[in-house]
Amino acid sequence: MTAKWEKQSGSLGVLTYEAPAEAFDKAVDQAFKKVVKTLNTPGFRKGKMPRAMFNKMYGEEALYQDALDILYQDTIEGAVVESGIEPIALDNIDVETLEKGKPVEFKITFVIEPDATLGEYKGLEYTAVETDVTDEDVDAELKTMQERGAELVVKEDGAIENGDTVVFDFAGFDGENQFDGGTAENYSLVIGSGNFIPGFEEQMVGLKSGEQKDIDVTFPEEYHEASLAGKPVVFKVTIHEIKAQELPELTDEFAKEMDEEVSSLDELKTKIRTRLENTRKQEADASMRDELVEAATKNATVDLPEVMVENEVERMVQEFTQRIQSQGIDLNMYFQLTGTTEEAMRTEMKEQAEERVKARLVLKQIVADEKIEVTEEEAQAELQSMSELYNIPADQLETMLAPQGGLDTLKGDLQFRKAIDVLVDNAKAK
């Protein structure tokens, strides 16, 4: 087989190759064996119709489309490997003639990654981020620690405030009728969390245990349940219990409970300050790198195939789904709680997907133009670093990475990191 790749406009190209006559004849035989199993022929058991009778009744040409599908599946992988291309999607399959005993010429139009035309990517400017840590920052971190160690104490007489955890019943009414999914008993909600429809939690503030109230809200226009979208409804709520956070005192004992490596509150404050400084420096570095990649991407020209953007949106949806599932929330529940839809989410993700795909192509072009390489030793060193970070043996980690391309994928990530290093080394603060 001789495969020939011819680049066309944009991200399209045509792969031409010829499958030998004997391969097509074999595919026709396979197609007959597949089709005959579905035929009931008088005088023969199902699937036992003779080939000669089939050809007489239907014509051998009736097998050609199935045979072509079989031949394509048997030959396309070898042709792609021989041509050296990495197709993203199939656009069209063209075969001019099909005749038994003759070779078959395939002309396959594929979508491939487009080349990025780089603009300015050296001498870019970035916004320097302040990394100093103040006493107020340390105090805020201590307050967060207090809240993590807080106990929920029942408020016997007090009214609901923001931050309180409330246990209550609710029933949603559209006019005189209750609607599905709008009713629950002994539901627990942190007021101010924003988990309910806008306006709901705010109207609970000030209520006391045992009290009831009708809460008027309007579902968002883009709400996933079309029958409720944009509709005003009433939730009848009954408050059962209100719990407020009781914060622990800031003492040396508190400090030791929060961090067994310190012996006093002052030591804890020092450790917090050091950690915040390191975190802010890392965040500042990440912000600078993101800003430079964004600028280099903006300066470049890339004709993005729609299929690449769609694939990226699909990846983003899967990532988001896995993230919320790890928090015990499925996608349908998320849409119900936030009043949005999957279609709206995908539309919102599309612009970000375009930027992500374009940025990858720009970095890939910088890797090519700068002739950036990653050695086997560098890849192994990165694998070892990941092993220590995730506390997983390096050989086990390499096995886990194998389905995603193993060390080759790791090398690609390191090439991108080095490409960003080129941007950083040639950039300056505004």
UniProtKB/Swiss-Prot annotation:
GO terms for cellular component: cytoplasm. InterPro entries: PPIase_dom_sf (IPR046357), PPIase_FKBP_dom (IPR001179), Trig_fac (IPR005215), Trigger_fac_C (IPR008880), Trigger_fac_C_sf (IPR037041), Trigger_fac_ribosome-bd_bac (IPR008881), Trigger_fac_ribosome-bd_sf (IPR036611), Trigger_fact/SurA_dom_sf (IPR027304). The gene is tig. It is found in: Cytoplasm. Consists of 3 domains; the N-terminus binds the ribosome, the middle domain has PPIase activity, while the C-terminus has intrinsic chaperone activity on its own. Belongs to the FKBP-type PPIase family. Tig subfamily. Involved in protein export. Acts as a chaperone by maintaining the newly synthesized protein in an open conformation. Functions as a peptidyl-prolyl cis-trans isomerase. The keyword Ribonucleoprotein does not apply. Disulfide bonds: none annotated. Residues 163-248 form the PPIase FKBP-type domain. Keywords: Cell cycle, Cell division, Chaperone, Cytoplasm, Isomerase, Rotamase. It catalyses: [protein]-peptidylproline (omega=180) = [protein]-peptidylproline (omega=0). Its main location: cytoplasm. One of its GO terms (molecular function) is ribosome binding. This is Trigger factor. The keyword Secreted does not apply. Its EC number is 5.2.1.8. One of its GO terms (biological process) is chaperone-mediated protein folding.
